[in-house]
Amino acid sequence: MLFLHGILGTRANWRGIARRFVEARPRWGAILVDLREHGDSLGLSGPHTVRAAAADLTELEGSLALPIGGALGHSFGGKVVLEWLRSRQGQLTEAWTIDSSPSPIGATRDTSATAEVIRTLEALPRHWASGEAFIAAMVEAGQPPAIAQWLAMNLRRTDGGERTFGPDLGVIRDLIDDYANADSWDVLEALPEGCTLDLVIGGRSEVFSASDRERVGQLANRNSNISVHLIERAGHWVHVDAADALLALLTSPRSPQR
């Protein structure tokens, strides 16, 4: 199972969930992926799109000795999973999207928390004496301490011993813009043969509009290989807000047709 983070995340975000997943489902292994221009996957050639990120997964599978049987993606990573499913026709594949709507989000991206974080990063220096100095600068600029500490996972040590923010923010903007405009509903409307898809929605999140929720429910009613799960107490960060509830879904017995 591939585990994919969201924008400005890293593969480490899903380490705890992945470990518990393979403990509960020992026939599976887990691969924590740094998506392009995140973590250790820096400097890949463009274009920087959801489709390119999905192609990276196909290339990753080609480099492994074992086949990939599934993928889970949060937020941006969820749309990467949906795009990746286009290449999975006739292959047994278990796919999970975590609070990731198939809809384009359009102009609303400019008011999102992620866009505000990027604006903050762009206004700050590129180098800091330490991780603590970076966190302090982010907090002083108005970001919550938890967000600043999470972003610090992207820091890299320079040859001079300083810290610099690893991802190229221009590339990150390209990825966000493509994600914001991507419409993945056709994947759900004609789910590739051999694939199952579970969509997990945070009950306190606004990522899925009321019409989105209604539409995925209708699709699930028509296709037994699509399931929708609402975790009422979770916000967008489902794996943080309700880790146990998410694990219960990921490790629940599959129905015969799945």
Language-model features: where?
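Conserved alpha/beta-hydrolase catalytic His-Asp/Glu region
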Residues: 126-178
